[in-house]
């Protein structure tokens, strides 16, 4: 089944690419954080928009929608979430852990970890409590007044909550904009103008096309990884029954690939099928890149 992509002109604030593009406007991003956190921020800096954190070739990587730091070295990851996959708590834990690992170099003191905020802006109520703002920090279960003070904060925003009135006018205006696109203050008007600018920008069009091409390539890589992982499993199951030549013929892979799989199985008996397949694909891509250069 072919995946259908929106045209740039069809994107809105709830689309990852559009959200990242709009938040590349420093003042808009800073003000969004100020509205959500209800505090003033002197300045922010971008380490890398839609930063990709990929720790190892066999580890799960993540691409962050917006990743910035402020003048106090606090880290902010802001994500748009449009699908209720029932895994947001675990996903937020994973994101925060990956961010921490990315910050801390091997051998560095844990004291170098920065205060981090993982913020999910959802178009649904992630906990079904009717709240528009869910903030989580680690506290002692037996004594809730005792905070762990590990400097990690998780926030989930639900614009459809029924308790917006306890927040400031800017927050209410932002929630209304997220729900309906309604413009009710200067900030939401600027957001709307920025979205319009992105839609007609040739530079953003070029970036969007580049992203679509990369995503399509990743889909192909994922398909290839799945096929190679299946091949590794079949080789493992039949290694004692057939030779490399016979396995190549039976499985439809060239003998060189089968031999590499066999070698990897013997050298790394503790590796699972996907890890072996990932390593083989990595080596092949490195070889292809060397040939091209």
Where are the model-predicted features located?
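Short, catalytically relevant binding-site loops at active-site mouths
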Residues: 125-126, 162-164, 195
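Short, charged alpha-helical interaction segments and adjacent helix-coil junctions
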Residues: 2-9, 17, 71, 76-81, ...
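Amphipathic alpha-helical segments in well-ordered regions
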Residues: 32, 36, 40, 160, ...
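Short conserved micro-motifs at the rims of enzyme active sites and ligand-binding pockets
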Residues: 130-132, 166-170
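Short helix-to-loop capping/linker segments positioned immediately adjacent to catalytic or ligand/cofactor-binding
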Residues: 103-108, 163-164, 182, 241
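Upstream accessory/linker segments immediately N-terminal to the RecA-like ATPase cores of bacterial MutS
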Residues: 142, 149-163, 172-173, 177-180
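Accessory alpha/beta interaction modules
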Residues: 1-153, 221, 288-293
């Amino acid at each position: 089944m072919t995946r259908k992509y929106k045209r740039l002109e069809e994107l809105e604030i709830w689309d990852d690419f559009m959200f990242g593009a709009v938040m590349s406007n420093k003042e808009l991003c800073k003000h969004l954080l100020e509205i959500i956190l209800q505090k003033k921020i002197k300045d922010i800096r971008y380490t890398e928009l839609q930063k990709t954190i990929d720790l190892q070739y066999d580890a799960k990587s993540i691409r962050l929608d917006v990743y910035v730091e402020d003048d106090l070295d606090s880290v902010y990851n802001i994500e748009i979430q449009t699908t209720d996959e029932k895994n947001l708590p675990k996903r937020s834990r994973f994101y925060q852990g990956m961010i921490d690992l990315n910050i801390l170099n091997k051998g560095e003191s844990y004291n170098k970890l920065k205060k981090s905020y993982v913020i999910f802006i959802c178009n649904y109520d992630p906990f079904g409590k009717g709240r528009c703002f869910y903030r989580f920090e680690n506290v002692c279960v037996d004594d809730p007044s005792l905070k762990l003070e590990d400097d990690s904060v998780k926030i989930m925003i639900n614009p459809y909550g029924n308790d917006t009135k306890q927040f400031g006018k800017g927050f209410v205006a932002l929630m209304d904009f997220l729900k309906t696109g309604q413009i009710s203050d200067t900030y939401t008007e600027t957001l709307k103008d920025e979205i319009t600018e992105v839609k007609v920008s040739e530079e953003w069009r070029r970036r969007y096309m580049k992203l679509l091409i990369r995503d399509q390539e990743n889909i192909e890589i994922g398909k290839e990884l799945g096929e190679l992982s299946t091949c590794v499993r079949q080789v493992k199951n039949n290694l004692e029954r057939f030779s490399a030549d016979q396995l190549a013929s039976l499985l439809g892979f060239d003998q060189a690939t089968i031999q590499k799989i066999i070698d990897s199985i013997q050298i790394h008996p503790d590796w699972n099928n996907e890890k072996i397949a990932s390593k083989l694909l990595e080596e092949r891509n490195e070889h292809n890149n060397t040939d091209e250069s």
